[in-house]
Each structure stands twice: as C-alpha cells, then as structure tokens.
Amino acid sequence: GEIGLMDLAMAFAEATKDESMCITGRPLGWPSNANVIEHPHDFLGHTGGGGLGAGPSIAVGAALALREIKSERKTVAILGDGDYMMGLTAIWNAATLKLPMLFLIANNHSYYNDENHQIKVAEKRDRPVERAPIGQRMEDPAPDLAALARAQGLEGEGPITDLADLPAAL
C-alpha cells in the first residue's frame, strides 16, 4: 500500500521529536501542524509555488550554513519525488561534502505541482484532462529513488509502503 502524507507526517514527527533539526522544506499538502517549530532554525519555510528541483539545493545550502555556525542540528529535507529527481546534483553535493542530512521523499509518482497545473489548464481550455499526466507521471518504469541516493554516495532505503516499517527507517 501507499503511506498517506498525514500518516507520514505524524510518523516523522514522532520519530524525530527529540532530534535537533532544521527542516528546510515540506511538500505540498504536508500538514502545517505536524512539526513543532519554536526556533528560527527549526523550519526555513516553503520554497514558494512548489518550484520543482529547488528543495535539494536549499537543503544543502542550509546544511552548509549550519556547519559554518557549528550547529549540532541535522538538516532534514522533506521532498516530493519530483523535487528530488530534479535536484540529484545537490544530493551528490550532500554526499561529497559529508553533510549530516536526511532526505525524506514523499513519493506520489508525479511531478505533481506541474501535473495539477496541466489539469487546470486542460479544464480551462476545454481539452481532455486525461492527457494532463503525460510527461508528469513517474511510472512505467518508476524510478528507484533509494538506488538513486546510493548512486550519489548516500544511504538509501525504500520504497517503504507499510507504516509499521517507517519508524525504523527514520
């Protein structure tokens, strides 16, 4: 099965409740109350407009800044799979610079922000909405996101499809 975004958020919050971390972004639809935010470095904010590919670079930049100020915080990038796929060069930088980071990928098998936009444009222009996913869905074949992490020199786990397996992976 699939793990829903709310379940993922709650499991992540529980698994990391005692961690000192800097969340650099969260995917569209992530519940805003899922994480305790008390310090300016707890959460850097959203990337604005769901811009694909920005998340990994923002996370690496944050990790470098935290290293510079000698912070003990771990950088956590909660990304959609589209953002992750478009930002693999930044993922490689995280590995080569040995940055203490966690990339948590919420995989909906889509460049969803763009797919959703395509649906709205199709509706507005009276075009078939069933064509909107063309070039937006990441299926057949679905990329092996964990293998891509390993190919960059990082550890990679997944896909995790059972909520019971999630805490150990985090």
Labelled PLM ranges:
Residues 69-86, 101-106:
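A short, small-residue-rich loop immediately preceding and capping a beta-strand
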